[in-house]
Every structure is written in structure tokens, then in C-alpha cells.
Amino acid sequence: MVMTDPIADFLTRIRNANQAKHEVLEVPASNIKKGIAEILKREGFVKNVEIIEDDKQGVIRVFLKYGPNGEKVITNLKRVSKPGLRVYKKREDLPKVLNGLGIAILSTSEGLLTDKEARQKNVGGEVIAYVW
């Protein structure tokens, strides 16, 4: 089966595993998925991320995070820039997700960054997703 949007598939798998209260999620690896997973870890949305190398493309193991009473840390994930409709923002037009409570993940010339990091580095780019 040919997958037209692997990033949307990755975000949907995280959303579904989160809704079902799974502890661990495994997805086929790619560089952009690794970058997104590392940003989610760095920003505190997931517990841990492991990259498992195999003879093929590898696997990313994401350990989801929940609050002390089982409440979800990730409320929602939204794919913004899609293969059929790319969304680019200049550095002065970078979005704030829920007035700074969420993050926007951007693909920039400096690599994958959050909206806050892109503002600090003074770069714009393609808005991959919103997470809150």
C-alpha cells in the first residue's frame, strides 16, 4: 500500500494510541518522523522516544505520557501543511497555538523547530503540525 502522507499517518497513530490510553506506540521510521518525535519529547508531550534500527528502515518507539490521574498530556494534534496544500509562514507570521499553550512544528532551513525556537532563530518555514 502506498502511503501519500506519512506525517499525517504518524500523527494519527499518536492521536489514536493516546485516545486508547496505550503506553507505547511503534511506527516505521523516517528522518522527519524522528525529528517530530524528538520535538514532542523535548517539549514534554511524550515520555521517551527510542529509535530501533533493523535491516529495513527502522522503527520509532514512542512512549506516551499521561498525568497522575490518567489525563492525556496531548489533547490534540493537527496536520497543517499537506501534500496537496503546503502552508509556509514567514518569521513575522509564525502562529501561536492556543496563545502559547501548544506548539507549532515547523520545517525550516535550520531543521525541524518549534514555533518558539523559530522565532528565536529568526526563521520561517513550512508549518507541519500543531500540538496542544
Curated annotation (Swiss-Prot):
PANTHER family: 40S RIBOSOMAL PROTEIN S15A. It holds the Pfam family Ribosomal_S8. GO terms for molecular function: rRNA binding; structural constituent of ribosome. Keywords: Ribonucleoprotein, Ribosomal protein, RNA-binding, rRNA-binding. This is Small ribosomal subunit protein uS8. One of its GO terms (biological process) is translation. The lineage of its organism: Bacteria, Bacillati, Bacillota, Bacilli, Lactobacillales. One of its GO terms (cellular component) is ribosome. Transmembrane segments: none annotated. One of the primary rRNA binding proteins, it binds directly to 16S rRNA central domain where it helps coordinate assembly of the platform of the 30S subunit. It comes from Streptococcus pneumoniae serotype 4 (strain ATCC BAA-334 / TIGR4). It comes from the Bacteria. Belongs to the universal ribosomal protein uS8 family.
